[in-house]
Amino acid sequence: FLSLIPAAISAVSALADHF
């Protein structure tokens, strides 16, 4: 489960950087 956290963070960072 913890391995999903960095992926989620990078996804949110990508969305935040896109907007």
From Swiss-Prot:
Chain positions with Phenylalanine amide modification: F19
Superkingdom in the source lineage: Eukaryota
This protein's UniProt keywords: Amidation, Amphibian defense peptide, Antimicrobial, Secreted
Localization per record: Secreted
Q: Tell me one GO biological process term.
A: defense response
Q: Does the keyword Signal apply?
A: no
What does the protein in this record do? Has antimicrobial activity.
Q: What is this protein called?
A: Phylloseptin-Az6
Species assigned in the record = Pithecopus azureus (Orange-legged monkey tree frog)
